[in-house]
UniProtKB/Swiss-Prot annotation:
Name of this chain's protein: Xaa-Pro dipeptidase
CC annotations in GO: cytosol
Keyword Protease appears in the UniProt entry: yes
Disulfide bonds: none
Family as reported in the entry's similarity comment: Belongs to the peptidase M24B family. Bacterial-type prolidase subfamily.
Keyword Nucleus tagged: no
GO biological process per UniProt: proteolysis
Required cofactor(s): Mn(2+)
Binding site for Mn(2+) 1: 257, 339, 384, 423
Name of encoding gene: pepQ
Record-listed Mn(2+) 2 binding positions: 246, 257, 423
Cofactor stoichiometry and binding remark: Binds 2 manganese ions per subunit.
A GO molecular-function descriptor: proline dipeptidase activity
Amino acid sequence: METLASLYNEHLSTLQQRTRDVLERHQLDALLIHSGELQRLFLDDRDYPFKVNPQFKAWVPVTEVPNCWLWVDGVNTPKLWFYSPVDYWHSVEPLPDSFWTKNIDVQPLLNADDIAQQLPVQRERVAYIGYAQQRAQALGFSAENINPQPVLDYLHYYRSYKTDYELACMREAQKTAVVGHRAAYEAFQSGMSEFDINLAYLMATGHRDTDVPYDNIVALNEHSAVLHYTILQHQPPAEIRSFLIDAGAEYNGYAADLTRTYTADRDSDFAALISDLNTEQLALIDTIKSGERYTDYHVQMHQRIAKLLRTHNLVTGISEEAMVEQGITCPFLPHGLGHPLGLQVHDTAGFMQDDKGTNLNAPSKYPYLRCTRVLQPRMVLTIEPGLYFIDSLLAPWRIGEFSKHFNWDRIDALKPYGGIRIEDNIVIHDKRVENMTRDLKLA
């Protein structure tokens, strides 16, 4: 088995090739990629938690250090100016010495402003990639060379195709997230509050709240009907009926994004609904293959939701086909099937059809779908169908010609459980689909 160092070396070669291509296409000499800067809280002397530029961590697994800079030209060894000030107020990261540093020219940067003296004087054909546009302007970059859209489009498009190094990192992130999910399930079983379940997850994964790739969703009972619920109640409800956890982890800057739903009563109707949605999710994954458009699988999932609505007597007197055609499945599954995953949880280029940035929007019927790409080998995506009981979405259906098909008594009986979401992370290969999540036996 190849070591992470050898995989990184191959990864770097791929990035160098992409850099040569994009520089040649846009008549540039180099890219200057900025890790980012600390952002000060308004009227305060503290900063927001630092979040690194994803284009920076694509090159080096440095995720917590601001004021770092990468100079890449696709030919010479990438040069990293690593921010290493003399500071007794804050901890300072030592110069890195790891599996990746033999391939990078690492130089200390004692003061953030010193970067101006380190760069070549002639920068007319250099593009700045980062979010500190005022800093780029101060360094003399013209507006057209600050995050030029054609360059970003190219870089974003090819980020969809993960290298072996990236896939190895994402599998490690999966392992960490699975450990956290198991700890959270045990906390739920013991009757803990949302707040304490979240602490159990963070403890098991070794993450802080600011380290996880997105805000953990830890929802008991009807809270799981809020798609991005992040309140974290400190006290458990008087009766615990259900538990939804949508939580991930990071490894070298790469994300995992997993969701599971559980019920306290394994013999309840809601438990049967969880089991059947799990079956349909796995069955859908079994049909996924390279060369097909992701949008088609989203539509297929709505057909499977219609099947569940019929078999669980939630919608009656209308065919499954008509349910999908009339949009009856939409209030039960209001979000997309999933999204690209990688350096970002909602990774780039979900709608991009080529490296020139050609966009294909989600269908108007399914506006929250986050990916319209044709699936190809090395893409990593989430598959996360849900089935929810959301008052605001169901309310319009209580009147009108289709109201008679909704079993409102049964729907209202399930509303206190909130909803279900089951999410796995998959890798597209030439002849198969790898389910990184299920490979780790997370049921």
